[in-house]
């Protein structure tokens, strides 16, 4: 499963339209890191805000109501040089905390992804507020293993997004 995910990530490097996948590409994506057919691929642990949440395929609303979504078209969360995994979560839901406290993180804070027995630890190195359609900070950077967490800002409404990038 990890090898197939790494091959998928390598193919993303040459796919300029990766954030708008075709139906076939989306079906392939959803089949990877999907051991139990629920779409759950692992979980994220953020000690600083006492957060441990399941990570699921896609950023569809049904996913974001219950957990953290993996942005299709971004690298799958298996690490490696030339990867950039992007994870999204809601803030301000009455039914769940999710990424409500994400704005409390600062540069140097650590979070960990647990995926198929792998443990990937990242350190926040950049915090930015961006417009909803701005994918500039989500690009893959040669030689880097990156993960960005993002959520809506200000609290409870989506005017823009807070991006926390980590390496």
Predicted regions and their residues:
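Extracytoplasmic entry segments of secretory-pathway proteins
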Residues: 1-41
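N-terminal post-signal-peptidase region of extra-cytosolic proteins
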Residues: 23-40, 66-74, 88-102, 134-136, ...
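Extracellular/periplasmic catalytic domains that process cell-envelope and extracellular macromolecules
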Residues: 35-38, 47, 77-80, 105, ...
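A generic structural motif
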Residues: 50, 91, 128-131, 153-156
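Mid-length scaffold segments of soluble, non-membrane domains
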Residues: 51-122
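Short, compositionally biased
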Residues: 123-135
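Conserved small/polar residues in nucleotide/adenosyl-binding loops
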Residues: 162-167
């Amino acid at each position: 499963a990890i090898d197939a995910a790494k091959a998928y990530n390598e193919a993303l490097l040459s796919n300029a339209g990766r954030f708008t996948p075709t139906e076939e590409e989306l079906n392939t994506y959803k089949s990877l890191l999907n051991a139990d057919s629920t779409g759950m691929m692992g979980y994220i642990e953020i000690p600083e805000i006492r957060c441990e949440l399941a990570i699921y395929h896609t950023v569809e609303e049904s996913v974001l109501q219950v957990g953290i979504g993996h942005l299709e078209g971004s690298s799958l969360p298996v690490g490696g040089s030339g990867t950039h995994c992007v994870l999204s979560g809601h803030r301000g839901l009455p039914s769940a905390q999710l990424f409500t406290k994400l704005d409390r993180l600062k540069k140097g804070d650590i979070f960990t992804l647990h995926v198929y027995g792998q443990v990937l630890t990242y350190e926040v190195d950049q915090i930015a507020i961006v417009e909803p359609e701005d994918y500039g900070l989500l690009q893959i950077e040669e030689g880097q293993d990156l993960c960005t967490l993002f959520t809506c800002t200000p609290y409870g409404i989506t005017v823009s997004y807070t991006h926390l990038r980590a390496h």
